Amino acid sequence: MTKEQIIEAVKSMTVLELNDLVKAIEEEFGVTAAAPVAVAGGAGEAAAEKTEFDVELTSAGAQKIKVIKVVREITGLGLKEAKELVDNTPKVIKEAAAKEEAEEIKAKLEEVGAAVEVK
């Protein structure tokens, strides 16, 4: 029996006969004819590319004075505020930065020995 003959036979069947055929095939081959259900509810949002990043200083490292200077340059803070920020790590240095800007800030801080995370 060819595929075409099987298709012609299926075309001539009633809905009840098709239902019986599907059940018989399921039993014979141990499969189900149910359509797979997608369970990924929030995955669509996670798949969208992130456009804003937070740059977090996790550790000042050994060259704290150089890190303070870079933090002042990036944030525009005064000496006292920048020192407090560096002393109380982990702290967010820049919020909602573009990807390129966040990477530049990270590179500047790592260059002077700081540990940085981009989130």
Swiss-Prot record:
Keywords for the protein's UniProt record, in alphabetical order: Ribonucleoprotein, Ribosomal protein
Entry keyword Zinc: no
One Gene Ontology CC term in the entry: cytosolic large ribosomal subunit
A Pfam family assignment: Ribosomal_L12
Biological process (GO), any one: translation
HAMAP family: Ribosomal_bL12
Function (record text): Forms part of the ribosomal stalk which helps the ribosome interact with GTP-bound translation factors. Is thus essential for accurate translation.
Family: Belongs to the bacterial ribosomal protein bL12 family.
Assembly mode: Homodimer. Part of the ribosomal stalk of the 50S ribosomal subunit. Forms a multimeric L10(L12)X complex, where L10 forms an elongated spine to which 2 to 4 L12 dimers bind in a sequential fashion. Binds GTP-bound translation factors.
PANTHER family associated with the record: 39S RIBOSOMAL PROTEIN L12, LARGE RIBOSOMAL SUBUNIT PROTEIN BL12M
Designated name of the protein: Large ribosomal subunit protein bL12
Source species: Bacillus cereus (strain ATCC 14579 / DSM 31 / CCUG 7414 / JCM 2152 / NBRC 15305 / NCIMB 9373 / NCTC 2599 / NRRL B-3711)
